[in-house]
Amino acid sequence: MYVAKDGYRRLKRGFHSYLDGLKAIHEETRLRHFVRSIEAFIRPDIGKTRKHFVYRGQLFVGHSSEISDLLGNLYGLRSCAEHMNDIHDFYAGLSENEIDKRTATGSFQAEVIANSTYRRVCERPDLLKLFASDGSIKAFWEKDENELREIWGVPVDVSSAVKERFNPYI
């Protein structure tokens, strides 16, 4: 990706956001950066960002109503951080402890998705080239859903990663 001087601009910006997420201390900031890094692959149309993030993001993590809700929540939390809205409004009625726990969990989930997505395209040159430019990314998402699944392969299991590797109290 970095060998191509003029290519992969969107993915490079997304990867920089991923690295910023790894360096960030606050969970809201980490989550914001990880979701933005995933968004680099999704290339949502203006005015359809949330819709495309949820729909297209399912290619990376699987298709189910639970996954759709997860992606919608991650995008909602990212929007809170991006627009400086109070995350307590997003989690209205929950205790401070529960808000912290859910935000940390969401941050980890977004990190897992971002990590697996960048790792996959960096390990597969055939896949990486499909994300070389905005035009190639647009063409990628115009493919038939079954073809997309065949090209991408097995989605990452976010819930298993959370069960195996996440401790919200650390």
Task: Identify the residue ranges that each predicted region occupies.
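Amphipathic, oligomerization/interface secondary-structure segments
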Residues: 1-170
